[in-house]
Amino acid sequence: MGSEPTKVMVAVNASTIKDYPNPSISCKRAFEWTLEKIVRSNTSDFKILLLHVQVVDEDGFDDVDSIYASPEDFRDMRQSNKAKGLHLLEFFVNKCHEIGVGCEAWIKTGDPKDVICQEVKRVRPDFLVVGSRGLGRFQKVFVGTVSAFCVKHAECPVMTIKRNADETPSDPADD
């Protein structure tokens, strides 16, 4: 009787530079690193769990003042946001299927650092992989880091994967 595959949760997000459906530099690097260095050709020994956490805008709109919004506008916006998240996940699911590694993907909404840790507790992966933008001390104070929070609070081992130096934009906060 075979053993269960090792479950690797990878947190993914959209690029702050290119937006949906493009993955951020750091999460794409973390995902690719996981496939290259951990999974390699042992695809049947692993299952990739892809989690995308969408941050909900306070009023539900990025560019439109909600005072002019109807209930239907809010419903349409939620459906549009979900569709964008699905397109992002599709990129990663397709990569998993190309190499033959099993995967599951889902979307949650909320504060990424909290939701990732809640999902780790719920799903119980063997370990979590997150990308890291490599922010400096000053930027960390104002921007904060999801990866540092997950290292401290997730109930499983956490691997943080830095971006390659040649992939870092002029503003490291961009991703």
UniProtKB/Swiss-Prot annotation:
* Any one Gene Ontology cellular component term annotated for this protein: plasma membrane
Annotated AMP binding sites: 11-13, 26-27, 53, 131, 133, 145-147
Name any one Pfam family assigned in the record.
Usp
UniProt GO molecular function: AMP binding
InterPro entries the UniProt entry points to: At3g01520-like_plant (IPR044187), Rossmann-like_a/b/a_fold (IPR014729), Universal_stress_UspA (IPR006015), UspA (IPR006016)
Which superkingdom?
A: Eukaryota
Q: Which family does it belong to?
A: Belongs to the universal stress protein A family.
Q: Subunit comment for this entry?
A: Homohexamer.
Protein name per UniProt: Universal stress protein A-like protein
Query: Taxonomic classification, please?
Result: Eukaryota, Viridiplantae, Streptophyta, Embryophyta, Tracheophyta
